[in-house]
Amino acid sequence: MKKIVTEYRVPYADTDQMGVVYYGNYMALFERARNELMRACGYTYKECEAEGFMLPVVHAEADYKSPAKYDDLLEISAWVQLVKGVRLEVACEVRRKGEDAVLVKGFTRHVFVSTKDFRPCPPPQRFLDIFKD
């Protein structure tokens, strides 16, 4: 399974009064990594929508191990951990660049839905060919 790593420098706006990255901002980092994963695999979200389906998030989880701070250079890894029926799960891990310790790990669960009626639909074969083990 393809795994990508994308970098992100923490701006001051992402931190809270405690001086650490606000917990909710990690979901935005997960989304950035998901988009880069799709792009690296040659199947962008824009193409998904043009082909008649979308992938809304229906569940998200994150385990916070250690905080990131202003100006940290982060590496966000992402990979598909499950494609089953109409479900897709993308796992993510966040580390400081050059360090092994995981700061945050988690995943997002998505459901394939039609752009016409937002009802669940099977994933296209092209998607399965790219992302399924």
What are the functions of these language-model segments?
Residues 15-17, 64, 101:
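Short linear motifs in intrinsically disordered/low-complexity regions
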Residues 2-59, 113-133:
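Hot-dog-fold acyl-thioester-processing enzymes
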Residues 11, 65, 96:
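Residue-level recognition of the GNAT/N-acetyltransferase active site
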Residues 2-6, 69-73, 81-133:
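HotDog/MaoC-like acyl-thioester-processing domains
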Residues 37-88, 104-106:
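Hydrophobic beta-strand-centered segment that forms part of the acyl-chain substrate-binding groove
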